[in-house]
């Protein structure tokens, strides 16, 4: 008898759940939507239950290094810039409308949060850092980070120069070193800039922020000089662990609420390796502080110690800082060269501009290259802007509705009506699609044309959001632009021609983890393969 009652109770609860979720809630949503003057959005058709086929296609696109274009193709199929999709039993929205992006990031900032699934996934590795928290915890983390990205620290380009010189040594001593052509001009061996640039930015970021560099470029140079032939990272190195952590987190983000099914063991191994390095940096900083030998202008670790509840939180904040200071810069710089090898006209014009502004290459640039001069070099800034327009470091982002709210446009037959967003709905937005809309950017929106930045269009602010916007705008924005600009100047000073060796004229290739970097039809992890000709001034 008792068993029968339990079964009956379970059946009744199941019926109540079904009626509530598939009848009452949709009806309440419809009535509230109409009351607010909102219109419906079309939903992407699905073939498999719970839209599992979308996840399958997304993972396939990632494997084929075409995730941003895969998403753009879905927008084209839907025929509008705001639409819905049902995924794993939940209704989500996706948009590439400037007004909706503005609402998500700024004007309706308090209506949206990171969302539980995304926050919990990132928290596994980044804990209580700025990327994995909302509300007061986010505000506190951002205020802790703000001083490290001050103009004074961003302007410390002399620290970067040492690492640039090491990278140039690697380029010019790879394999048999420089070789000469029929015109007696010196060329480098084939080299992947997408491999070298993340090492450069990690080495400089760890030195600037922690006072202790990872020196991954110096280690690579030593291996090269020893003719070991082994260009792989040490499996336990900080640099390798950081790369693998990002790759795993990227895949887990595409699995959404099922993120916990993938990569747990390897992710934890990576986190342990990263924590070991951070602990050694903390100990070294403590020792330098006690002996009075610390070279840090702003002791970020000491600030963390006073603001964080324990050593574990210090580690988490450091990893968040390195994610902000390393990945944005590395991805941007790699994409710049990805574009330049495909556009020799732009490379020549940029080089002529750089030589006029900063002079020819010298191993000791002194004060010729400064924060102010980089900002004032107009064509250099246009090249950076155009690169970020075509190849956003983060081509997709998302927010979750913290309460019942609306988006300004996208509903109704022509998409001009507001859209009702029930509490808990995830809203995805694609900067990749937004930045390539021909109705906003012209018929040449898919082409690399830095000159388009000579004139600003009305309303451009929310048509162009490579670093997001509003209160959560990327805190490392100026750091990334300054460091990328510096590296670009030094490279075009040194090399007058760059020859791409993995160019595919048919399509772009994207290596998408948590951030998006160039991919390659030859080798995903060795993109922007090129030869460089040493300049003779």
Swiss-Prot record:
Localisation per UniProt entry: Membrane
Domain of life: Eukaryota
SUPFAM superfamilies for the chain: Cytochrome P450
Cofactor(s) listed in the protein's UniProt record: heme
Enzyme nomenclature, EC number: 1.-.-.-
Sites where the protein binds heme: 474
Keywords: Heme, Iron, Membrane, Metal-binding, Monooxygenase, Oxidoreductase, Transmembrane, Transmembrane helix
GO terms, molecular function: heme binding; iron ion binding; monooxygenase activity; oxidoreductase activity, acting on paired donors, with incorporation or reduction of molecular oxygen
Pathway: Secondary metabolite biosynthesis
UniProt-listed PANTHER family: P450, PUTATIVE (EUROFUNG)-RELATED
Function noted in UniProt: Cytochrome P450 monooxygenase; part of the gene cluster that mediates the biosynthesis of alternapyrone derivatives. Alternapyrone is a decaketide with octa-methylation from methionine on every C2 unit except the third unit. All the domains in the polyketide synthase alt5 are apparently involved in alternapyrone synthesis, that is, the 8 CMeT, 7 KR, 7 DH, and 4 ER reactions in the 9 KS-mediated condensation steps required for alternapyrone synthesis.
Name the UniProt record assigns to this protein: Cytochrome P450 monooxygenase alt2
Organism encoding this protein: Alternaria solani
Gene: alt2
């Amino acid at each position: 008898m008792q068993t029968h009652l339990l079964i009956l109770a379970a059946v009744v609860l199941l019926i109540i759940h079904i009626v509530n979720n598939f009848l009452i809630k949709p009806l309440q949503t419809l009535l509230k939507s109409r009351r607010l003057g909102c219109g419906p959005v079309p939903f992407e058709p699905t073939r498999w239950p719970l839209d599992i086929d979308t996840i399958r296609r997304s993972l396939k696109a990632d494997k084929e290094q075409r995730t941003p274009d895969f998403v753009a193709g879905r927008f084209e199929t839907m025929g509008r810039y705001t639409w819905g999709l049902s995924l794993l039993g939940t209704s989500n929205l996706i948009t590439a409308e400037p007004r909706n992006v503005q609402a998500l990031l700024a004007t309706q900032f308090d209506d949206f949060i990171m969302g539980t699934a995304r926050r919990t996934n990132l928290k596994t590795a980044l804990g209580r850092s700025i990327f994995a928290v909302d509300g007061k915890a986010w505000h506190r983390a951002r205020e802790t980070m703000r001083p490290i990205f001050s103009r004074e620290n961003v302007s410390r380009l002399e620290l970067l120069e040492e690492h640039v010189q090491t990278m140039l040594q690697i380029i010019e001593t790879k394999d048999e070193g420089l070789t000469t052509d029929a015109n007696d001009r010196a060329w480098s061996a084939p080299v992947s800039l997408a491999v070298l640039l993340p090492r450069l930015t990690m080495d400089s970021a760890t030195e600037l922020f922690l006072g202790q560099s990872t020196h991954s470029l110096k280690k690579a140079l030593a291996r090269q000089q020893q003719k070991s032939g082994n260009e792989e990272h040490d499996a336990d190195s900080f640099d390798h662990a950081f790369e693998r952590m990002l790759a795993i987190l990227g895949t887990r983000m595409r699995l959404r609420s099922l993120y916990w099914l993938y990569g747990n063991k390897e992710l934890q191994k990576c986190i342990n390796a990263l924590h070991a390095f951070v602990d050694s940096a903390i100990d070294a900083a403590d020792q330098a502080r006690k002996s009075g030998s610390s070279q840090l202008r702003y002791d970020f670790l000491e600030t963390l110690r006073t603001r964080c509840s324990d050593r574990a939180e210090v580690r988490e904040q450091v990893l968040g800082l390195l994610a902000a200071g390393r990945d944005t810069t590395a991805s941007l710089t790699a994409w710049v060269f990805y574009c330049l090898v495909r556009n020799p006209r732009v490379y020549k014009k940029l080089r002529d501009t750089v030589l006029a502004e900063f002079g020819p290459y010298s191993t000791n640039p002194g004060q010729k290259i400064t924060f102010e001069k980089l900002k004032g070099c107009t064509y250099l800034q246009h090249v950076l802007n155009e690169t970020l327009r075509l190849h956003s470091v983060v081509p997709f982002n998302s927010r979750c509705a913290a309460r019942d709210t609306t988006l300004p446009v996208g509903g109704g037959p022509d998409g001009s009506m507001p859209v009702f967003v029930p509490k808990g709905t995830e809203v995805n937005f694609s900067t990749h699609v937004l930045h390539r809309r021909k109705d906003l950017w012209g018929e040449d929106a898919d082409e690399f044309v830095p000159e388009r930045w000579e004139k600003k269009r009305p309303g451009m602010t929310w048509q162009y959001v490579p670093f997001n916007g509003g209160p959560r705008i990327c805190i490392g924005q100026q750091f990334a632009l300054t460091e990328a600009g510096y590296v670009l100047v030094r490279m075009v000073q040194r090399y007058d021609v760059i020859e791409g060796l993995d160019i595919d004229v048919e399509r772009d290739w994207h290596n998408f983890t948590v951030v998006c970097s160039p991919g390659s039809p030859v080798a995903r992890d060795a993109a922007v393969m090129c030869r460089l000709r040493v300049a003779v001034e």
